[in-house]
């Protein structure tokens, strides 16, 4: 490949959801992007099925939220962990109405359709070139200023970096069965409309209400493999139907796919080496018990995109990219460690230990929410939360969502007198976010392009200091 053909600002290896989103975000910023994928076609069967309200907000930043919302199913329901007798042990709360990010808090979707929307979004940008059916043999082939590996758990780019894996302790094979169900069948109608984690020591399972599908409704069963199960044969209908016949049978649904996956919990140390960077499964993997695997990769893309744009455009030093791993690794590790703890509750197969587990919840179900961790140290003021957490997205007086008024820029929100006459190229939004600021005992906040809080201020002097401390020249 000649440099005249492929010289670009950023080359992305992998055109799955993470790579395609990153290419959309960089394309918006006018960067020259080449994105590669070894497969010519989108994988036609479902894999990830859930994302949260923060991720929908990221899709909004990419200008694709309305199309993705039309293709997905918003849900106000949570996730229930129940024991073998059906008693609820734990509940991840749902969110009624709009969540703090201006969208429903949970969404279910069909991954091939999501990928089609993301790839179609790339056609908006003449500065983004897509190379499908193109297998990269070495990163040395890529004549680009930066290379981002969004190429999954067997990442070529990660091997070139030499990242070090950190094992977080969970590795377990599960069977994943997607069914297209008759929406009028009585047994289908009787299924819960929320996700269920069945903590049955005889056979732990997960049941997910995904949404509508051609010819019916899609439901997913994830079934833990037990000693004696043959992974090569358990995918056969004759073997998996008996596992789920207490809910459905062949007369109620047809299998769309059955496959065995080993769920892993691992993070990599070393997300960057020179021009090489990682995002998504190439630098972390989580079991699906919190529904946050794809979400984590898309957060990577949102964090990395504005930093790459700032560096390439010359408004920030290259060292800004070092903050990517330092911020994201502890953040994603919080989610993975919670998923591992939930997996310990779900995957208990010793009957006496399961009875002891159930007794811990005799006083009532434990309620929990998604964590809201602080970013690690990096492009933010060194201060406790709410610095380093994501700012909510209110609707403005003119009807727009806040992010629509900001674009991919820094912003300052808060009390009007503090913002009046402030010398900065950041977007000023006086009177916005006052309830949030009052909750935290502050009067103003400086927001990054990914809407994480760079700094908060109690007075004008603190606000001026925060704006002066920005390592990126806003604009």
Task: State where each predicted segment sits.
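FAD/FMN-dependent oxidoreductases across multiple families
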Residues: 71, 231-296, 335-338
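Conserved FAD-binding catalytic core of PHBH/FMO-like flavoproteins
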Residues: 80, 120, 146, 150-263
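Active-site-adjacent segment of FAD-dependent monooxygenases/related oxidoreductases
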Residues: 47, 52-121
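Glycine-rich FAD pyrophosphate-binding loop
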Residues: 27-47
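An active-site-proximal "capping" alpha-helix that borders the catalytic cofactor pocket
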Residues: 298-312
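N-terminal Rossmann-fold NAD(P) dinucleotide-binding loop
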Residues: 19-20
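A conserved short coil-to-beta-strand element within the FAD-binding core of flavoproteins
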Residues: 132-141
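Helical substrate-recognition/capping region of FAD-dependent monooxygenase/halogenase enzymes
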Residues: 1-9, 13, 28-29, 38, ...
């Amino acid at each position: 490949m000649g440099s005249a053909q492929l010289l670009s600002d950023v080359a992305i290896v992998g055109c799955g959801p993470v790579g395609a989103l990153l290419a959309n975000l960089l394309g918006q910023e006018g960067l020259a992007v080449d994105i590669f994928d070894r497969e010519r076609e989108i994988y036609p069967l479902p894999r990830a099925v859930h994302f949260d309200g923060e991720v929908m907000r990221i899709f909004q930043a990419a200008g694709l939220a309305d199309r993705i919302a039309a293709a997905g199913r918003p849900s106000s329901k949570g996730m229930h962990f129940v024991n073998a007798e059906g008693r609820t042990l734990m509940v991840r709360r749902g969110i009624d109405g709009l969540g703090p990010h201006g969208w429903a808090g949970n969404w279910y979707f069909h991954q091939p359709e999501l990928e089609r929307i993301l790839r179609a979004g790339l056609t908006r940008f003449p500065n983004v070139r897509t190379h499908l059916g193109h297998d990269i043999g070495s990163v040395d082939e890529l004549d680009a200023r930066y290379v981002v590996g969004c190429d999954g758990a067997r990442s070529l780019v990660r091997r070139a970096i030499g990242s070090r894996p950190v094992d977080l302790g969970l590795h377990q094979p599960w069977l994943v069965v997607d069914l297209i169900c008759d929406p009028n069948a009585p047994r289908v109608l009787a299924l819960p409309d929320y996700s269920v984690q069945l903590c049955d020591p005889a056979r732990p399972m997960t049941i997910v209400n995904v949404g509508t599908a051609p010819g019916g409704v899609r439901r997913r069963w994830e079934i833990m493999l037990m000693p004696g199960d043959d992974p090569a044969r358990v995918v056969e209908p004759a073997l998996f139907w008996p596992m789920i016949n207490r809910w459905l049978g062949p007369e109620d649904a047809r299998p769309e796919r059955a496959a065995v996956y080993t769920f892993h919990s691992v993070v990599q140390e070393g997300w960057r080496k020179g021009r090489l960077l990682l995002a998504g499964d190439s630098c972390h993997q989580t079991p699906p018990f919190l529904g946050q695997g794809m979400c984590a990769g898309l957060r990577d893309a949102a964090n990395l995109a504005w930093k790459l744009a700032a560096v390439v455009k010359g408004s920030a030093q290259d060292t800004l990219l070092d903050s990517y791993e330092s911020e994201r690794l502890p953040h994603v590790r919080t989610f993975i460690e919670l998923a591992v703890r939930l997996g310990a509750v779900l995957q208990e197969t010793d009957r006496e230990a399961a009875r002891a587990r159930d007794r811990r919840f005799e006083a009532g179900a434990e309620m929990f929410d998604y964590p809201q961790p602080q970013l690690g140290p990096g492009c933010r003021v060194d201060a406790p939360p709410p610095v380093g957490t994501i700012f909510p997205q209110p609707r403005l007086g003119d009807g727009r969502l806040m992010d629509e008024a900001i674009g991919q820029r820094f912003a300052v929100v808060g009390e009007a007198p503090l913002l009046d006459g402030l010398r900065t190229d950041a977007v000023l939004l006086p009177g916005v976010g006052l309830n949030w600021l009052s909750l935290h005992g502050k009067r103003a906040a400086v927001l990054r392009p990914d809407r994480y809080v760079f700094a908060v201020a109690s007075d004008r002097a603190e606000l001026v200091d925060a704006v002066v401390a920005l390592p990126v020249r806003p604009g």
